[in-house]
């Protein structure tokens, strides 16, 4: 059946998932031909592309918040979504209604010349929606790698690299040097590049030099430091002192501030401070607040006052696990209880690398099953954990909420329950608390 602009979004998404013979098929030829035909390669007067292993989402969010507070019209394309596809395209900090997406999908479908992957289709649709909205700035979050990612059909004015670590090795290579080369594919000749990774592989620096990019590197051109009450950011011209703590990692906030220095907009220090206080993104070391704690208590049939501290995080690789370990270690100084993990991970992720950072701080593990062709069972994950770290206490459950229920039953008020390991893990939990 031919889908129409008025067909339900769920039907369109099902169609997108099946529209190409491979779910991931890196390359720019298919998508670029459609984008050129529809004149989608220039979605706004200024475009920022953000790549990196971790930290892309929070860096994009702070850049978006700053630019909106400066009074600009801003669009953001990000992935993956947590609960609803609509989260992937934001215009003026608003998700678009289903009808906007289905109309855009129909337009792309009518004009495509060959089959497209889900991500290629959604990228073209986002660019079409941005162009219709007449924006000042578009922020594109890279989906996978950079050089061959669908977002790379657009020549951005500023490239941002948040971090570099080993992930997606089937597509990007199994060394930091190979991965850095792929991520450097978003660089453009004579355009500025901001790098938030402190240990930059030479392959990335070589690519920047080859293209005559103006590079702004962490700990070389700019730096940040934090203390118990606030933090500071500085480069060779600007020093921002007594900055407010924010709800995203300092390294990502600092990278966004470095990117702001490269923009052609005169953004005030007041706007930066206001934005740091406002910025937040679901699933990034996020403590569950009172209203959602009540929903969890109702769901489990327990008094809300008996619930422990509950934190969710989408971290799913060793680099993210290291950050989690640091945050949990700091938290442990202020509580008296145990650290309990509810962990669900996709089978193509480096689970042992994640466990290595977290087993010293986690007192008990509940490994849970994730569905889908990339999912793995809680039993498989628990076996991996116990085979490499035989001293740990680990059980398995058939779903995220089964694991959460088991963990919360064993926890007391001063404990911490961490739900993490994948966007899918957090999404399954979040669907209940929302």
Language-model region placement:
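Charged, amphipathic alpha-helical linker segments immediately N-terminal to NTP-binding catalytic cores
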Residues: 1-22
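Nucleotide phosphate-binding/pyrophosphate-handling subdomain across enzymes
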Residues: 132, 137-140, 150-160, 164-168, ...
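Hydrophobic positions on the alpha1 helix immediately C-terminal to the Walker A/P-loop
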Residues: 58-62
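Extended acidic/charged loop-beta regions that coordinate divalent cations
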Residues: 125-171, 205-239
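Internal gly/pro-rich beta-alpha loop/helix module
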Residues: 171-186, 191-258
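Hydrophobic anchor at the beta1->P-loop junction of P-loop NTPases
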Residues: 48-50
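C-terminal helical cap/extension that packs against the catalytic core
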Residues: 194, 198-203, 210-212, 225-228, ...
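ATP-dependent carboxylate-amine ligase catalytic core
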Residues: 8, 23-24, 28, 35-45, ...
């Amino acid at each position: 059946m031919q889908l129409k602009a008025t067909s339900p979004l769920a039907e369109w998404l099902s169609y997108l998932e099946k529209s190409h013979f491979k779910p991931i098929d890196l390359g720019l030829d298919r998508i670029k031909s459609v984008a050129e035909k529809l004149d989608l390669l220039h979605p706004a007067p200024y475009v920022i592309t953000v790549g990196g292993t971790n930290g892309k989402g929070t860096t994009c969010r702070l850049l978006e918040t700053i630019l909106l507070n400066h009074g600009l019209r801003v669009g953001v394309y990000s992935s993956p979504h947590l609960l609803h596809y609509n989260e992937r395209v934001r215009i003026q900090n608003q998700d678009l209604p289903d009808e906007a997406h289905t109309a855009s999908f129909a337009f792309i479908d009518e004009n495509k010349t060959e089959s497209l992957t889900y991500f290629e289709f959604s990228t073209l649709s986002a660019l079409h929606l941005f162009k219709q909205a007449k924006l000042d700035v578009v922020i594109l979050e890279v989906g996978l790698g950079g050089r061959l990612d669908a977002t790379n059909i657009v020549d951005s004015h500023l490239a941002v690299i948040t971090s570099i670590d080993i992930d997606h090795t089937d597509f990007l290579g199994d060394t930091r040097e190979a991965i850095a080369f792929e991520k450097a594919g978003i660089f453009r000749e004579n355009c500025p590049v901001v790098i938030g990774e402190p240990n930059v592989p030479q392959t990335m620096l070589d690519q920047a030099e080859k293209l005559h990019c103006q590079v702004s590197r962490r700990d070389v051109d700019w730096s940040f430091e934090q203390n118990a009450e606030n933090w500071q950011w500085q480069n060779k011209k600007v020093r921002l002192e007594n900055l407010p703590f924010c709800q995203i990692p300092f390294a990502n906030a600092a990278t966004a501030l470095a990117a702001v220095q490269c923009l052609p907009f005169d953004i005030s220090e007041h706007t930066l401070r206001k934005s740091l206080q406002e910025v937040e993104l679901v699933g990034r070391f996020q403590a569950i607040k009172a209203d959602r704690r009540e929903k969890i208590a109702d769901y489990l049939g327990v008094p809300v006052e008996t619930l422990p501290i509950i934190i969710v995080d989408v971290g799913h690789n060793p680099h993210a696990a290291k950050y989690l370990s640091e945050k949990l270690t700091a938290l442990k100084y202020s509580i008296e209880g145990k650290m309990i993990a509810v962990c669900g991970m996709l089978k193509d992720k480096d689970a042992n690398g994640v466990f290595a950072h977290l087993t010293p701080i986690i007192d008990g593990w509940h490994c849970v099953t994730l569905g889908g062709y990339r999912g793995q069972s809680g039993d498989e994950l628990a076996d991996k954990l116990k085979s490499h770290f035989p001293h740990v206490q680990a059980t398995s459950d058939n779903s995220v909420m089964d694991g959460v229920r088991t963990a919360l039953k064993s926890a007391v008020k001063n404990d911490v329950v961490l739900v993490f390991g994948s966007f899918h893990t957090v999404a399954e939990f979040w669907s209940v608390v929302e």
